[in-house]
Amino acid sequence: RPGAGARSWIMQGSLWMIFASMFTFTSMWLTHDPDALHSLASWGYTANAEELASAGVYATLYGTVSMFIIGCSFHIIPKLAGTELASETNANLVSFVWTISVLVLVIGSQNNSILGIDIIPLGVALNNIVLLAVIMNQLLTVANKTRNIATPGWLILIALLSSPILAIVSIVSGAANDNVGQWLTYHIFGGTFFFAGVAGIALYASSIASGNP
């Protein structure tokens, strides 16, 4: 159905907002009282404020904000392009894979290695695979446009494309093998994806609200 993909992403993003709030609140609680959840040790889990704060960051940035941005993009870009989303089924299905990738990142923030497997890189790899599927879906949608895409659409496309472009630049330049280069690439991507994505959505929303789409 039209809009099913966008709804799926936004609903799951809302669910991650609840978990992000729980992780962040629990982290702040443990910072105030480190022994508040010591009873969980009998279940084999030792709650740690820093680890829960990391889980809150992953759930907020990748689970909530990223899913909201991508979900909104599945609504905005087809509207601006004067066409339908290339594949609602693809948009719907990959949202669940993205949720799994965020879950892997959250688990990795608590235990980075399980059975000798590094969890965080696995979650990041899964995350990037889903992002490539999202980008392909949006590019196919743009290819079928019936009118010129306004600025909000281009801002959102720039946000989505920033990850693979920066990954290629990092590999070609050799920055991927350097700790400083990895840090810089990560923060440039974060700035581009979140800023351009939110800016595009805000510009579209303000244009619609003012009656000047």
Task: Kindly give the residue locations of the regions a language model identified.
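Hydrophobic alpha-helical transmembrane segments of multi-pass integral membrane proteins
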Residues: 1-213
